[in-house]
C-alpha cells in the first residue's frame, strides 16, 4: 500500500488509471468514519477519463491518526501536500460529507489548485456543537462500536439497508475499525468549521449534490450552499447521506457529466 509523509502524518493513498498518462486528475475525499474504499463504485468509470487519486483522510483507514483535535486547515493541507508529493499541479476534487467540507475550503482558499469541485452531501457548516462535542467524547471514552448503531442508520435509507446487508456489513466494519482518536479529532475539525462567509467567494466551477432523505446534511443545506457559490449547479438524488454508494450509477453519471462537459 502506498503512503506519503504529509505535514508530519503518514497518509495512505491509491491511484487508479494511467498514472503516467495525460488524463486530468481527480482527488476523492472520504466521509467521516469511512475510508477510500467508499469510492469503489465510481473508480472504474472515473478512471476511463481521469487519473484517480483516493486517500484516507488523517485518522481514517490506513492513514496515521495523530492526536487531535484536527482543523480544516490540516485537512486541506493534507490534500495539497499529497498533491505536491505526487507532483499534481491541479486536479478536480470530489468529496462526500466531511470530504465535501474539505472541498469547500479548498475551493474558497486554494482555487489555483482546482479545476472543478463536486461537493456531495455536505454544507458550508455541518451540524452544531450539540452534535459534535458529545459524539467526539463518546468516541474517545467508549470507542467506535458504541456509536455504530446510532450513526450508520442515518447514512442510508431503510429500503437500502434492508436490500444491501452485505454492503452495510462492510461499511460497518470500516466504521468500527476507524481509530477512535482520529474519528473524534475529525469531529472536532468539523465542529470548528463554518465556511458560510467564504462560500460566496468561490470561483471554481462547482456541483453540489444532496440526498433527498439526508438528515446529516439536508437538501436545504445543499441548496443553500449551491445558491451561495456563484454559478454552482445543484442536483438532488433519491438517497440518504452516502449517496455515492446508495445511488452509485446516478451519482457517477452526474459527476462525470459535470466534469467532462465542454465549457
Where are these regions (language model features)?
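Flexible "cap/lid" loop of the alpha/beta hydrolase fold
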Residues: 101-109, 113-148
Amino acid at each position: 500500500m502506498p503512503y506519503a509523509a504529509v505535514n508530519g502524518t503518514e497518509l495512505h493513498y491509491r491511484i487508479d488509471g494511467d498514472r503516467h498518462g495525460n488524463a486530468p486528475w481527480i482527488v476523492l475525499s472520504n466521509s467521516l468514519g469511512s475510508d477510500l474504499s467508499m469510492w469503489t463504485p465510481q473508480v472504474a468509470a472515473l478512471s476511463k477519463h481521469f487519473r484517480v487519486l483516493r486517500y484516507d483522510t488523517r485518522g481514517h483507514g490506513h492513514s496515521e491518526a495523530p492526536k487531535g483535535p484536527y482543523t480544516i486547515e490540516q485537512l486541506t493541507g493534507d490534500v495539497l501536500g499529497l498533491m505536491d508529493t505526487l507532483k499534481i499541479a491541479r486536479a478536480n476534487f470530489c468529496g462526500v460529507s466531511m470530504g465535501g467540507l474539505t472541498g469547500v475550503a479548498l475551493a474558497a482558499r486554494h482555487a489555483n489548485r482546482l479545476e472543478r469541485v463536486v461537493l456531495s452531501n455536505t454544507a458550508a457548516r455541518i451540524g452544531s456543537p450539540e452534535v459534535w462535542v458529545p459524539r467526539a467524547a463518546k468516541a474517545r471514552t467508549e470507542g467506535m462500536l458504541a456509536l455504530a448503531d446510532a450513526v450508520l442508520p442515518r447514512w442510508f435509507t431503510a429500503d437500502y439497508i434492508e436490500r444491501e446487508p452485505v454492503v452495510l456489513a462492510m461499511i460497518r466494519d470500516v466504521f468500527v475499525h476507524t481509530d477512535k482518536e482520529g474519528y473524534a479529532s475529525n469531529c472536532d475539525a468539523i465542529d470548528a468549521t463554518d465556511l458560510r462567509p467564504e462560500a460566496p467567494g468561490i470561483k471554481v466551477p462547482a456541483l453540489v449534490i444532496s440526498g433527498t432523505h439526508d438528515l446529516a446534511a439536508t437538501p436545504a443545506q445543499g441548496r443553500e450552499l449551491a445558491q451561495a457559490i456563484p454559478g454552482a449547479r445543484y442536483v438532488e438524488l433519491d438517497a440518504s447521506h452516502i449517496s455515492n454508494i446508495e445511488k452509485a450509477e446516478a451519482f457517477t453519471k452526474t459527476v462525470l457529466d459535470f466534469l467532462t462537459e465542454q465549457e
